[in-house]
Amino acid sequence: MPSLAKWLGDTLESVMASKFIQVKLTGKELVAPAVVKLYFEGNLQGIPFHEGNAVAFRVNQIDYRNYTPSYWDDSGCEIIVHLHSNGPGSRFFEQIQPGAQLKMLIPRGRKMFDNSFATHTVIFDETGLGYATSVFEASSKNGQEFYAFGNVPGPVNNIRFPFNATNAKNGQYHLLEQDFQAFLDRYWIAAKQGAFYMVGNGKLVQITRNVLRSRGIQRQQLFTYTYWIEGRKGL
């Protein structure tokens, strides 16, 4: 969601009160450098959730930030958040502690999972760990194949799925493409007829999509969602 004047945000929460759920932060766990998993409890019964949907929190008087849940059921959800010093959402969740009561805007937005495919491959960075987890959960539930390629800094702990990792820092696009090509070479026979989901940094999405198109992957197999772009206001 965009930034809103304080009075408009207050009005929104009043007029759309049924769209906001009261949740309690019950746990906070570091799973990777500058990446935390947040555990929320609340009455989510009857609220639909689809992989790729986002919830939103008001992180200060004027800013809302969207996050894709990694897990969702009737009694609570999990969200994986990338923390950095440049964004209001990052500052908010860096400071908040278990026990805090929050208003959460219910899931909405894109549906980024097509269960008509038998194989699902997710390409992501540290901002897409939550989404990748949700696709793993959905594909496992359906008995479908799942593969993952992540550009993340350092080791990742307590994530429910295995993935091939690279650590191509800003500007190291040749390394990102090289490692992604090697990943595809390893899993190509199994993955090439399936769906490919690319989320996170705009450059990661662009590079990996171009690689897949050059290998003959059709547009209807590709699903993309750019979460952030270098130089833009942070998460």
Residue positions per predicted region:
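Extended, composition-driven regions rather than compact fold-specific motifs
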Residues: 1-235
